[in-house]
Amino acid sequence: MSTPTQSLQVKLLDPRFGDLWPLPAYATESSAGMDLRAALEAPMTLQPGDAALIPSGIAIHLADPQLCAVILPRSGLGHRHGIVLGNGTGLIDADYQGPLLISTWNRGREAFTIEPGDRIAQLVILPIVRAGLQVVDTFVDSARGAGGFGHTGVR
């Protein structure tokens, strides 16, 4: 595994980390995200259409205002079982220090049971660009212009 390029402060809020479960980690050399686990006390079944906030068992503090973290779904859970994030993407600001909760939604057609310790989401650290607004009357023309949804076609 490659050497981390950024330090991340983490609080372990669940004593099963380090004993029963490994710390969040990158699964492969080129993984962009660290898997987050369901720090549940007992199995939780999500019926079709149900949503739940699931504790990850950790809190993080990025501290660097040029970074943020995002909680993203795991592709296999979404594709195979319809388990996605209820809020699409969870955005974690650099100054947030509270527990990471995973908004989980069953958009599938069948009930799905999440077991304690299941890897249900992933955490990705991203750089942030903070823009200053410049009010203008018109924009410089671009090839796309104001073309929106579907404007460029599918072929």
From Swiss-Prot:
Q: Which InterPro entries match?
A: dUTPase, dUTPase-like, dUTPase-like_sf, dUTPase_trimeric
- Keywords annotated in UniProt: Hydrolase, Magnesium, Metal-binding, Nucleotide metabolism
Q: Which family does it belong to?
A: Belongs to the dUTPase family.
Upper lineage is: Bacteria, Pseudomonadati, Pseudomonadota, Gammaproteobacteria, Lysobacterales
What catalytic activity does the UniProt entry give for this protein? dUTP + H2O = dUMP + diphosphate + H(+)
Broad class of enzyme this protein falls into: hydrolase
Q: In which pathway does it act?
A: Pyrimidine metabolism; dUMP biosynthesis; dUMP from dCTP (dUTP route): step 2/2
Q: Which gene encodes it?
A: dut
Its biological purpose: This enzyme is involved in nucleotide metabolism: it produces dUMP, the immediate precursor of thymidine nucleotides and it decreases the intracellular concentration of dUTP so that uracil cannot be incorporated into DNA.
Give the superkingdom in one word.
Bacteria
The protein's name in its UniProt record: Deoxyuridine 5'-triphosphate nucleotidohydrolase
Query: What species was this sequence derived from?
Result: Xanthomonas oryzae pv. oryzae (strain MAFF 311018)
What cofactors are annotated for this protein? Answer: Mg(2+)
Gene Ontology MF: a single term: magnesium ion binding
Q: In its UniProt record, which GO terms are filed under biological process? A: dUMP biosynthetic process; dUTP catabolic process
Task: Report the HAMAP family cross-referenced here.
Answer: dUTPase_bact (MF_00116)
Q: Which residues bind substrate?
A: 74-76, 87, 91-93
